[in-house]
Each structure stands twice: as C-alpha cells, then as structure tokens.
C-alpha cells in the first residue's frame, strides 16, 4: 500500500505563481529572495512530527532517496519558469535553507549538488547563507567537512533536549553527549552552527528545561531556536494523549519555559530577534 499523501494546499493547476508571490513588498522595497529545499526522509518518524517526511518503510519497495535530487532539479527549473512568466526579475538567492525531514539522510555530495543547482537556476548572492538541518547522529566530521568544502556555510542541529527521558518521549534517538561533539566538528570545518530546542514535552519539568538551556549555552552555538511543542492531530503523540498515555502540554508551563529561555539566552549574550530565535550579534538568519 502506498503511503498517504500529505495534506496541504492543492498543486497549482496552471503552473503559475500565487498572486502574493509576485506582488511587490508593502513598503515598496525589493523582497529578499530565498530558496527553501525540502528533503522528506527520516530514519525514524518522531511521534510529534506532522511534516511531510517518509521512512524507508513508508516509501515502500522501489523507492529511492537517491533519485530525489533529480526530481528536485526539475522542480527548480519549473519554479524559475513560473517566475519568468510572472515577470519577476532574476535575482540571486541571498539564503538557501535545506530542511526536512532529515536532509543529512542524503550523502553529502547530493546536498552539495542541490545547492549547486540553485546556483545554476537562480544564482547565489555573494556571501549567501547556505544552511542545512542535521540530525546529530547522521553526520560525522568527514560529512561536515564535505559540506563546507561544497559551499554550505551553516548547519542547524536538532538537539531538542539534553535530558534523556525527554528525548525518549520525543522519539529522538541521539545521545545528549553527541551534540557538543558534532558542533565541534562543524566549527573545525568552518561552518556556523545553530541548535534547535523543543520545550513542553510531556513529563518535562522546569528543571529538565533548565538543564537543556544550560547545556545549549555551554555548547555555545552561533544561533539558537526554541519551539514550544505542539501536538498535532493525526500524529502518534496525539494518539498517545487521546489514550491517556501522555499528558497534553499546558499553556502556562510552556509560557514559563519560554520566559526562562529568553532570560537564560539573553544572559549568555544571545539577542532575541524573532519569536523562537536568538543569535549572537551578526548571526541572525
């Protein structure tokens, strides 16, 4: 049986861009041009995840992760053609972000090739920020070095928590001690670093969250994101909550954890610049 298709907006029937994409910015300035590339593959699907991603089991026989870059290349050319039809001027991308899923399920050469295709189709601005998300357990030092040599500039690692029982609830399979190791490797390769954290997991205490914040600050990435857990209907975690196996996160608890994060990160020299993001000066993305 083929996997169910993700729910979302229907594909455009005409091949044209939505009107809001082609519209000028409200202030009359030129809109910055960025490219997001999605890699919809994971080794294990986390119980809270409602993103468009598939495991090898979900893809079924005959499916190939390696074929994805070829398909993505076609999609980028279609996007460029739609922009041309809309009369949008060709502008090099100022930022490229590869998300997922787990982009580092691909071999490094495929990620580098994806960025190269963006350069061929749209161009890359001088000093463009090129980021990929990464699971700490899917990379080693050689992998990160290959990314840096291939033109990527930044890696965002999915740390989520420094507390083992919280990682277990979130279905994360890496060990907490893996995160500082991969950040060191990334720095040696010349890559900027970011860490993603999640707060509000069932069973996570305020002390657990404090430990995660302290661990993240000690690692000292250039950038940090902290997201409140949202349990979406249809996910495995939603079913666990419905069955009474896990408690639903409480709004007051998540609000207190957000305030704790802001205070801890501000005290460590990180500047809040967007709802869920803090950065060292100059490291905003």
In which residue ranges do the predicted regions lie?
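C-terminal scaffold of the Radical SAM
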Residues: 17-34, 52-85, 91-285
